[in-house]
Amino acid sequence: MSFDELPATGTIRRAPTGTIERTAPIRRVEPIELLRRVPYGRLATSMRALPFLTVARHIVCDGRILLRMHSGFGHHEACDGSVVAYGADNCNDAASGDGGDLWSVQFTGPAEIVHPCPEQERLFGAAPVSVNGEPFAPAYLRVDPHFVTEHTLNF
C-alpha cells in the first residue's frame, strides 16, 4: 500500500517496509507540522543505561527533525545511531492565557549526528549564549520519525 492509498486517519507509524500506516483520525494539521509552531522541545534517550531528557531547538526539513543542542554534555554522542524520542507541545499557551486547544507530539526514531547547511543553520535562529554557565557549543542531530504520537486537550 502506498502513502497515497492510506485511509484518512491521523497518528502515523512507519512499518518495517518503509510504508506509513495511519491509526487515528486525521487532523487538519499533521503532527510534524505542529513542530513549526514552537521553537523548542525535549529529547529523550539513555546514556550509560540511565535515561535523560534535554532541551533542544528544532526545525523540520524534508520530513525529518533537525535538532540543535549544547555539545558540552555529550548528549548528541549518546544519541548518535540510537533510537530517541523527541517531543514538543504548546502547553505554555495555557499558562500564558492564550486559550485554545493544547497539543503534545512525540516522534520516535533513529538519530544521527549531522552538519547542517548554512540555510538550515539560519533557520535555527540565534543560539543561546551559555548553558549552565558555560559557552554554548552547538551539536546537531537528525531524527527520522518512525512512530508519531499526538495528544490534544480540547477546551
For the regions a protein language model found, what residue spans apply to each?
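Charged, gly/pro-rich active-site loop segments
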Residues: 2-14, 21-22, 89-155
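Short, basic, glycine/proline-bearing loop/turn elements
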Residues: 14-18, 59-60
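Short connector loops at helix/strand junctions that flank enzyme active sites
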Residues: 38, 53, 60-62, 79-83, ...
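Short, basic/aromatic recognition patches
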Residues: 16-42
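Conserved short secondary-structure elements within globular domains
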Residues: 83-84, 124
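Short beta-strand segments
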Residues: 38-70, 86
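Short, surface-exposed beta-strand-loop junctions and turns on beta-sheet-rich folds
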Residues: 73-75
